[in-house]
UniProtKB/Swiss-Prot annotation:
EC category name: lyase
Protein name, UniProt field: Enolase
Keywords from the UniProt entry: Cell inner membrane, Cell membrane, Cell outer membrane, Cytoplasm, Glycolysis, Lyase, Magnesium, Membrane, Metal-binding, Secreted, Virulence
GO BP annotations, alphabetical order: glycolytic process
Sequence positions that bind (2R)-2-phosphoglycerate: 167, 343, 372-373, 394
Gene that this polypeptide is encoded by: eno
Natural source organism: Aeromonas hydrophila
Induction (UniProt): Three- to five-fold induced in a murine peritoneal culture (MPC) model as opposed to in vitro culture.
Length: 433
């Protein structure tokens, strides 16, 4: 009943109007799984390769016909007759067939779309929700939790056309008792932030991830207007709502000069100086998590940052670790950061993603499940967060259906699981239990 009989790939459109790969996996019993690959804007240099056509006459070179050739040709042929329930074998067949270190032959976008579609088809064949199937693949059947959201309500950096250098300013509704309540609190702060920005004469257009993208005077002002919005919504900053940031510091790092350049406010920092700047912000605001607070190659700087802040807050590696167990192991062995951001298109298969989550948890690191800035209506990351009991999810703001689709899926899952999937709030964040 779970043998693969057909694999289909197609080109669909993501939330930025660019093509991406969608795959369908059909099984013997008439079961079908469908999934789409997301796409990043600020990408780590060690990520698995997203294969684009480069033909400027189609989609400005961003077409994915080459990746589709792989899905509809060699991948489809190699998977015929294989058991979809054996996810590790399905993924390994594609990885071996590609034969490159970074999946550059077929593209991580091709392999991932098929990998996720296969998991969905297998879940359907087993007659269980995707999150339950993922928990079984993870070796933790029946173990679930609802993740604490990190909601990106002010967008800067590569996610917005403004003068704010730090890429994401996020809220975490830690005072909520349930995921559904956390979503409501986030929505209320989001709407109050719109009022605060308008009252100051700022633009309320949104960025790629659904957060506002105003031209603020400084990065600290982003935290100040969020603090105002939290109060206006009737919540207490630090108790009901905490703050988180994704610096995406590789985007404003000058490798030649070894400097971090916040152009928006005309300030330049050394590596340790930027970590000291972040420490100052954590003293002024209840920031409990900082992601990519330095360039992905600045391991020495990350050692200093972890030593400085790693006992107080969550230090998340995104571009630093790129969901790659080899790189994560180096971080763990050297005491670099204490958390990993999980983006399955950085590594390119569900099996490898689950391995990264397990390695992180075994080492006492937290794992934050994440979307990409280029998304679709595919909500697989919601099931991944619940099925691995990861504890935290980052899936954008309270606008744009490509973001909200994930929150809505989480609401449905929480309703289905009830007390079997506890919402632990701030306890999920490293150093905040």
């Amino acid at each position: 009943m779970s043998k693969i009989v057909k694999v289909i790939g197609r080109e669909i459109i993501d939330s930025r109007g660019n093509p991406t790969v969608e795959a369908e996996v059909h099984l013997e019993g008439g079961f079908v799984g469908m999934a789409a690959a997301p796409s990043g804007a600020s990408t780590g240099s060690r990520e698995a390769l997203e294969l684009r056509d480069g033909d400027k006459s189609r989609f400005l070179g961003k077409g994915v016909l080459k990746a589709l050739e792989a899905v509809n040709g060699p991948i489809a042929q190699a998977l015929l007759g294989k058991d979809a329930k054996d996810q590790a074998t399905v993924d390994q067949i594609m990885i071996d067939l590609d034969g490159t270190e970074n999946k550059s032959k077929f593209g991580a976008n091709a392999i991932l779309a098929v990998s996720l579609a296969n998991a969905k088809a297998a879940a359907a064949a087993k007659g269980m929700p995707l999150y339950a199937h993922i928990a079984e693949l993870n070796g933790t059947p029946g173990v679930y939790s609802m993740p604490l959201p990190m909601m990106n309500i002010i967008n800067g950096g590569e996610h917005a056309d403004n003068n704010v250098d730090i890429q994401e300013f996020m809220i975490q509704p830690v005072g909520a008792k349930t995921l559904k309540e956390a979503v409501r609190m986030g929505a209320e702060v989001f709407h109050n932030l719109a009022k605060v920005l308008k009252s100051k004469g700022y633009n309320t257009a949104v960025g790629d991830e659904g957060g506002f993208a105003p031209n603020l005077k400084s990065n600290a002002e982003a935290l100040e207007v969020i603090a105002e919005a939290v109060a206006a919504a009737g919540y207490k900053l630090g108790t009901d709502v905490t703050l988180a940031m994704d610096c995406a510091a590789s985007e404003f790092y000058d490798a030649e000069k070894k400097e971090y350049n916040l152009k928006g406010e005309g300030r330049v920092f050394t590596s340790n100086g930027f970590s000291d700047f972040l420490e100052e912000l954590t003293a002024k605001f209840p920031i409990v998590s900082i992601e990519d607070g330095l360039d992905e190659s600045d391991w020495e700087g990350f050692a200093y940052q972890t030593q400085k802040l790693g006992k107080k807050i969550q230090i998340v590696g995104d571009d630093l670790f790129v969901t790659n167990t080899k790189i994560l192991k180096r971080g763990i062995d050297n005491g670099i950061a204490n958390s990993i951001l999980i983006k399955f298109n950085q590594i390119g298969s569900l099996t490898e993603t689950l391995a990264a989550i397990k390695m992180a948890k075994d080492a006492g690191y937290t794992a934050v499940i994440s979307h990409r800035s280029g998304e679709t209506e595919d909500a697989t990351i919601a099931d991944l967060a619940v099925g691995t009991a990861a504890g935290q999810i980052k899936t954008g703001s309270m606008s744009r259906s490509d973001r909200v689709a994930k929150y809505n899926q989480l609401i449905r899952i929480e309703e289905a699981l009830g007390a079997k999937a506890p919402f632990r709030g701030l306890k999920e964040v490293k150093n905040q239990a």
